[in-house]
């Protein structure tokens, strides 16, 4: 029985599936989260800075250092200065790796305007005219401007008596343990590694939970799955080969068999999505 993958266990099973199919038991993997950090321009949050979730107790460490700038940012915080009659303030923005061009958001001040009223007008103008960015006013009357799509980064600039004082920068983070559960949106919001000028952190999307060591049953099923597709079409063989790689958690293979492009896939093309992977 130790030579039959259907009955072998533990080390014997590992040796057999590696011998017959080149498969290795999948090891535990940490959880992964995308974070949004907000801080003062010029401040750097070091790599491996910790953030946590008070609901789950899980702790994540940033995967790389983050410096707050008004370029390659997901958003900015604006401070409106002293206002004079007929002064003009404007906010310009662009998306990285996009050909789209957007007109600047421009405000011309009136006789009764104050810094607060101009800030409110700027927020209203952004929210009523732009489908790309949104804005809100905080308790200090600073204007927060962010791309609506959290995956978008871009460059921001201002003219007139309005300054960029903070920015939002995205970063990925990895759990400190292999037992972290899914972190619901906005629940990773505690800064555990304080940095002067780093004010906020949150996760715009649910995280990806940790995975456990692959069990004998899971390894055996993956072995049977890989063998069942060896003699089938390219799409199935590709799926099997990718899913067998160490660290891979999810595979999706979409094929377009038509003569014309369809849903972003070229004619007779294949689009592959893979989550995880150590190779």
Please give the residue ranges for each predicted region:
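Short beta-strand/helix segments in adaptor/scaffold domains that form protein-protein interfaces
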Residues: 1-279
């Amino acid at each position: 029985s130790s030579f039959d993958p259907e009955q072998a266990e533990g080390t014997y099973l590992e040796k057999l599936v590696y011998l017959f199919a080149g498969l290795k038991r999948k090891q535990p993997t940490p959880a992964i989260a995308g974070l949004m950090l907000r801080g003062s321009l010029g401040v750097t949050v070091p790599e491996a800075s910790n953030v946590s979730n008070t609901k789950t107790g899980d702790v994540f460490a940033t995967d790389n250092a983050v410096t707050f700038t008004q370029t390659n940012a997901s958003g900015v915080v604006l401070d409106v200065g002293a206002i004079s009659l007929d002064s003009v303030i404007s906010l310009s923005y662009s998306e990285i790796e996009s050909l789209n061009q957007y007109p600047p958001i421009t405000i011309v001040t009136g006789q009764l305007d104050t810094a607060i009223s101009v800030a409110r007008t700027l927020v209203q103008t952004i929210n009523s005219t732009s489908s790309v960015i949104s804005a809100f006013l905080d308790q200090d009357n600073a204007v927060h401007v962010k791309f609506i799509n959290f995956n978008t980064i871009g460059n921001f600039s201002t003219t007139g008596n309005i300054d960029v004082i903070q920015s939002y920068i995205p970063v990925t983070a990895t759990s400190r343990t292999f037992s972290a559960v899914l972190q619901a949106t906005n629940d990773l919001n505690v800064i555990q590694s304080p940095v002067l000028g780093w004010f906020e952190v949150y996760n715009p999307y649910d995280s990806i939970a940790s995975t456990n060591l692959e069990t004998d049953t899971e390894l055996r099923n993956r072995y049977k799955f890989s063998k069942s597709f060896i003699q089938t079409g390219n799409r199935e063989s590709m799926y099997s080969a990718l899913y067998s790689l160490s660290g891979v958690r999810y595979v999706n293979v979409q094929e377009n068999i038509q003569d014309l492009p369809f849903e972003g896939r070229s004619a007779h093309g294949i689009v592959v999505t893979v989550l995880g992977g150590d190779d």
